[in-house]
């Protein structure tokens, strides 16, 4: 028995009302962590099967020319989702305490990358900050690279 599983699931669908598997506000990151937390909170169990392997080849579905664009997307959504998850499951004070400390670190990393003229890194960090701030302000997970 485990607390969290990512990537591959076999579930008893009858345990879920109205197919409420996923929180539709979350996009890309923390979906499985959120689902696992809700499963455990409802007194259900999560098990892993040791002799079954799955493989996830990250970013294999796109052309390499989109790598940087996808890194920006990843930077934005990971930080948005992390704050949202913490706020949803541990409360607003816990979420803001964690996020404010991380935001300060991000600002210092951003300034450092600007000083050393690492513009690609600066932009990635800026997207991390942007995603985190949007979540902290209660904005939805709206960033999509093909729309922005």
What are the language-model segments listed below?
Residues 3-53:
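A short, conserved alpha-helix in the catalytic core of glycosyltransferases
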Residues 25-29, 68-75, 122:
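Flexible, glycine- and charge-enriched loops at secondary-structure boundaries
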Residues 73-81, 92-148:
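Non-catalytic, C-terminal membrane-associated alpha-helical segments of glycosyltransferases
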Residues 85:
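Short alpha-helical functional segments enriched in proximate histidine and acidic residues
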Residues 88-89:
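Alpha-helical structural context
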């Amino acid at each position: 028995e485990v607390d969290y599983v990512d990537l591959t699931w076999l579930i008893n669908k009858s345990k879920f009302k109205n197919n409420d598997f996923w929180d539709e506000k979350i996009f890309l990151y923390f979906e499985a962590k959120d689902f696992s937390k809700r499963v455990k909170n409802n007194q259900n169990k999560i098990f892993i099967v040791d002799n079954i392997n799955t493989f996830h080849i990250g970013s294999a579905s796109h052309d390499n020319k989109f790598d940087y664009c996808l890194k920006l997307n990843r930077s934005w959504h990971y930080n948005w989702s992390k704050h949202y998850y913490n706020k949803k499951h541990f409360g607003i004070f816990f979420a803001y305490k964690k996020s404010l400390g991380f935001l300060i670190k991000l600002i210092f990393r951003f300034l450092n990358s600007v000083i050393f003229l690492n513009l690609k890194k600066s932009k990635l960090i800026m997207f991390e900050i942007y995603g985190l701030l949007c979540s902290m302000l209660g904005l939805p997970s709206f960033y999509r690279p093909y729309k922005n």
